[in-house]
Regions:
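N-terminal capping segment at the start of a domain
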Residues: 1-20
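Predominant activation on well-ordered alpha-helical scaffold segments within soluble catalytic domains
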Residues: 6, 10, 30, 124-132
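A non-catalytic alpha/beta surface segment that caps or lines the substrate-entry region
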Residues: 17-60
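Active-site metal-coordination/substrate-binding segment of hydrolases
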Residues: 60-138
Length: 138
């Protein structure tokens, strides 16, 4: 993973958010989408963010990406995402030749571990990556 993508992933994972308290992630998305050329977006009353890029001819369809902006872990004011040791072998003892795996973990500023909501926030990350990669996305 190149540094630009890794930095974006760490940035998305570091946004503190929780169910019904998604304002931080919504604002993060607005800031990122404002900087993306040719992307139009709006936010509805429920804080859902809808973004599109490009135009289609009649009968064509956008690829569409959907992700959650909330997580279920305890909300903390700041999440520090750190790269930890590369994981090899996996937790079941399997090895994959010479492959190594990056581990990202979240901590509070005082060093306590915290959830990063990676299952939801990785969807946000992927949606942003698709907006960068494709001409027509919704």
């Amino acid at each position: 993973m190149d540094n630009t993508r890794l930095n974006r992933l760490k940035e998305v994972l570091s946004v503190p958010t929780k169910t019904y308290q998604e304002e931080n992630m919504v604002q993060y998305l607005r800031d990122v989408l404002d900087a993306m050329p040719d992307v139009e977006y709006y936010t509805d009353d429920l804080k859902n963010v809808y973004a599109t890029k490009g135009t289609l001819n009649e009968g064509e369809y956008y690829p569409m990406f959907i992700a959650h902006t909330d997580t279920v872990h305890q909300l903390v004011d700041k999440i520090v995402v750190q790269e930890e040791s590369l994981v090899k072998p996996d937790t079941f003892g399997h090895t994959y030749g010479d492959e190594e795996f990056l581990s990202l973990k979240g901590y509070t500023p005082n060093g306590s571990s915290t959830g990063i909501g990676g299952d939801d926030k990785c969807g946000v990350y992927l949606a942003l990556e698709m907006l960068d990669a494709y001409d027509n996305v919704k």
